[in-house]
């Protein structure tokens, strides 16, 4: 045993300039090293050769290695050996792994050991790396401090591997840079020659130290341009460790340590490393399992899940074997619910948390994004199971909305013409055992609330229990509770086409040989249950208000289905009249709710088939329904009381009234509906524009001013449509002058409401008013110039592309125009244009003519006072801008701009005492 107190006293007398805590003030490094070395030589009992021999024996270096280290050749080598021996002596005589009082050391002494270790790692590791490492800014400072010595580096590596076992040294990440330098040193030696000691050193760093730090350091090294041998070695280390346990998770963690890179970028980097064609199939399969385990672990962390899901998708795309493996793993997620091993009454198969976690995992895997998740066609076989789970979950649970998103993603990505109808047909017929078979809940399984009402349990029910699969109730309920209205419309059209086929198909079933009640029940179910489910589903969906708005955009498909149905009914008299009657009632509800469908060409083509159906059918209810439909198509229909109470129709009816106060009340209702984003109102955007333009012609100012407010609200829903319609109306030569002037006011109000977004439509707005300023109608021309002046101010004077044309219009009006109010407005435009000139030098050839014109107008006492006032304002603006320009020019002593690089060919003038801050240093 040695007296460790003397060694701590020795460390206290040294100054560690390269320790992490002292790097901010490391001037005089060479002097500090020399001073430290003298102190070590003074108090060391052993000669340096004996210290070296003792270290080589302890760390398993051969005699050849020892002989290749010459301490006398370099003072730095001597310093490395002596400092290493001091730390080795402390490590050997203090049991850092013991909690006994006699083995504990003070925090100050532990800090000395850490600083000495950091100093030693700088000289013994960082200063002896492969020359290519010094291309990196993190290592370049250590280049040329010492000539690299293979044996000395190997000795230092062995020393630090033993030192890193002491966990107290790792406090506050004190060994982070030591581990980085150690890994770089190991790789540098591996390039020169292989050694079992180096393999063990890398294995230790991977197994016992932070795996995330290992990957981070490897990626840090690879960021530098290295020689092929070194680059390949690092690449092999990266890929080799990646396929070891926890490799994928550690790689993601390493990239997430950088807060400046977003999660999507990190995910792309990870996926490009993980999903490579060069990996063996076995390695790819192991990686798939790793990634899935990672996703399960980080379910609640969306940022980290992004990397896992994207990597899994890239692995899925690599090979058919990977696809098969992923499909098998996905099936095992629900095997307990589809094919439970034990079916014992009351047995709990899955608790609340497990079920919610599995649903959340699938949401991440399939709904995280459009490109980074697994393909949605994998979900098709699980649709029955997912719909049953959705039906069993309480609506207030997050898992309910999550599983809803999964189902919606699957259905929405299916092709509408063939694929989606085929899926819906298989669901409603419940032919899930046909090839390819689909998965569903075991008939004995039931989802019930647990003792805690906010949680659920999946249990085995009584043997007489049958799992519910009422698609006519479950699927429409899911669709109408979501905001995915376009998908609701697709499903509605598919189901409508499906029921049309069911009505047209003659049933092959016969009642002649039914001999029992069970057979009768099966016959009735097979003949009528499917049609009943379809009608219930359609009835539930057609009552969904947003669906009608969507159907107005799919008029052609809807009416094509109905036309085929009517053609078949006119040929076949034995079709079920009750089903046809329900379909006709559905059509009437849709037509009553959408005027666009009533006016479509396809709807008018139905008239012939409806006439034929009405004359051939003996059913009075069908005849009455046909009569009502023909009335709607002919345009003689008036809204029913049920339709009138709908918010949009009520607002529209009020606007169409003759009394001003009723119109304004209807306008306010319409504005409120637009603010609430009412789906039925938004779907009638073009109709609202037409209604507003008609109301704008009202002579009552109370009405048309409120109508302008309606345009202001409407612009938030359909910007370009509103501006295009208003511009066309403003420039219409056939419209009344007062109406055109009001439209101009509406355009300005709409532009004000758009604010900065108005810049996107400046071409439409400016061209509209510039065209109007050429009108032969004096009042209209004056209005156009006034609107131009206000528009220039709204656009923050960003009218450079139109500047010359605007000046020509103003000049033409002032020289040839005879209407004084128009001239006033033209001078106002000129003043506003001067206000918008950011740099007068860009328009210097026009400044003198503008100045002379404004000066002449202001000086002419016979001129209109308002014109003189506008001209005076323009001159003030011009004077202010010219003064500012001249002042800035005087400050620079030249109107020419100069770019001067300070410090190059500068004459140091003694007069320049107050130098610029960039010239300091």
Swiss-Prot record:
Coiled coil: none annotated. One of its GO terms (cellular component) is Golgi apparatus. The keyword Transmembrane helix does not apply. The keyword Transport does not apply. Its main location: cytoplasm. GO terms for biological process: Golgi organization; protein secretion. Signal peptide: none annotated. Disulfide bonds: none annotated. It comes from the Eukaryota. It is found in: Cytoplasm; Golgi apparatus. It holds the Pfam family RTP1_C1. Keywords: Cytoplasm, Golgi apparatus. Belongs to the Tango6 family. May be involved in protein secretion and Golgi organization. This is Transport and Golgi organization protein 6. It comes from Drosophila melanogaster (Fruit fly). The gene is Tango6.
